[in-house]
Amino acid sequence: MKSRPMADRIYFDNAATTPLDPRVMEAMLPYLTERFGNPSSIYSYGRETRLAIESARKSVAQLLGARPAEVFFTSGGTEASNTAIMASVLDLGCTHIITSPIEHHATLHTVEYLKGRGMVTLEYVHVLSNGHIDMADLEAKLKAAPGKTLVTLMHANNEIGNLTDIHAVGRLCEAAGAIFHSDTVQTVGHYAFNLKETPVHFITGAGHKFHGPKGVGILYVREGTKIHPLIHGGGQERNMRAGTENLYGIVGFAKALELAMASLDEDAARILEVKLYMAERLRETIPGIVFHGDAFGDSLYTVLNAGFPRTERSDMLLFNLDINNVCCSGGSACSSGADIGS
């Protein structure tokens, strides 16, 4: 089927993925053509691509307020979260995990796997009616934890947009001697980080969430946190991630993050204005509509989750929007094949 031109469609699913910025494509193009060397090679082709990767790492670290040695490139957010969670258990001695029931499947399915293998005990922190984490319950669970604990909580929820105060969570973890991993896939590129001042052991990012390429992400590992690789083989990524690097993806990730952070304040104000306008018009037009989460409070400006009154017409809502060239989703893109709601 021939796809429609993007100009003819309205795209409302940027939490799932974003179109590639032409300036990012321009930065990537030389590494798809003449600069094709294997970064592990010692001759000139390899040296120039190695330089590109290390320059990208330095740029990403600077933009996130981290050290270059703390940034590792991965295939995306899922691999990065898997690496952090598995390493917390296998290398850092965590025998207990606290998470929430509304995490991304990259987290939920990983911790459930570890529990199923008998490697950890698992608890879910209470979620308040507005979608926020119950911080008092988290503190109580940390105090009562039966062993060294990993807390894994996302920074911004990919479906309702709620923001979790990762500084507050990190302080609770520090007091309890716990490891803290935060899935920050929705906020890297959309939020100003200073990781040197953030009490977190691991965060994750994915380039395609901020107009970069798919198939490339990052794992931040705080200095002094000693872990082993999830993927074994060669010594790439300073022995932390085997396999020939996604050269053009890494270059694209760094360029996309540079562009995103350069226009962050302007973009955030503009997108928030659109979000609030959309909510206002939906309220005026559709009686009984509800907005899930803390949509107009501690919420990411890029996400709006609306619930429509159940009717025969609403059951066909997404289909009818699609045939009218409006693209939006009824839940996480990673769960779009499931036959149950979010």
Describe the residue ranges of each PLM region.
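Pyridoxal 5′-phosphate
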Residues: 1-342
